[in-house]
């Protein structure tokens, strides 16, 4: 056998071995089928996304009115679904009491809570000091019960300029509606079970999704008007992995893809230390004309590392603790000796093949909803029409004009 024939045989053996190694097992195929066959559609800002049926998630968005230095903003977050009026009232009562219990030691120990005002049976406005200070800087929260969805709107005011901030919150509260079918959300920014039909200028949002009691997590970042990154994803990946991983990682896949009908890139890597392995998949889109229906989108799927504990389905979701201002959350803190032992890091619960198959199914499902962005209203448009007096006057003028032509006929 010649040397050329020997190398040819070795190449065939190597390729055959690689192909066999990369073939998914029957168990992997079964797992992928279970994860991707019956997926649930979620509303995702101006778009839609399909995720494995047992995943849950949430998110928040910040809306900007105006793009200059004098812009204002409102943060919107869904605190709970399936919330009754009784739970809504109880949560608000606890929240107000916890904030009021803290004293502003810069203002002669007056309560941090300035006011709590019920606007309607389903909405309450809270105002409290942003921090312990003599300055007139406040946080304003409008808590809403939109059918059975608990929504919190939050904005800040400075130098005692309170009225326009509260007016903005009250106006926005009339522009939030519950959505039962994400596909039918219509125009507006969708945040889980609600759609926000506000005429704002910019929106920045983050979403998270994960399976129950798992090490797997998907995070999505949306910025409507953000320009594209100057350096493409593959360039930043090489730099970041060199800095944080000393270049010691597995490049599972990388390259251009399409995301929501826009150009995009993906970078899929795996890395290990002495205790466990992790995988990190990242994708981002690129567009020349940023707009509300062509937002910058970043996706990040991770697996391995920390495994989250299971949620007790019989225990109602805490509607207060996680969104309290930091100065009012002390009652929830536990001493170090009462904290649970840190859990050992785990390897990914998905194989590379399973993770890549789920990743592909998720990214291919991302699409912008038809009619998700409504035209902005003309500020000079008057929709009310003429008053009866104005209509009568217009008719009189028209009649006189027609009569003048009749009089000229020979």
Report residues per predicted region.
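Charge-rich interaction segments
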Residues: 187-231
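C-terminal motif of bacterial Sec signal peptides marking the signal peptidase cleavage site
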Residues: 16-17
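Bacterial N-terminal signal peptides that target proteins for export
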Residues: 1-7
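N-terminal export/ancillary region detector
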Residues: 52, 67, 138-140, 154-157, ...
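Signature of long, low-cysteine stretches enriched in small and polar/charged residues
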Residues: 97-144, 217-310
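Post-signal peptide N-terminal segment of secreted/secretory-pathway proteins
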Residues: 20-41, 48-140
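Surface-exposed amphipathic alpha-helical segments
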Residues: 55, 153-195, 299-410
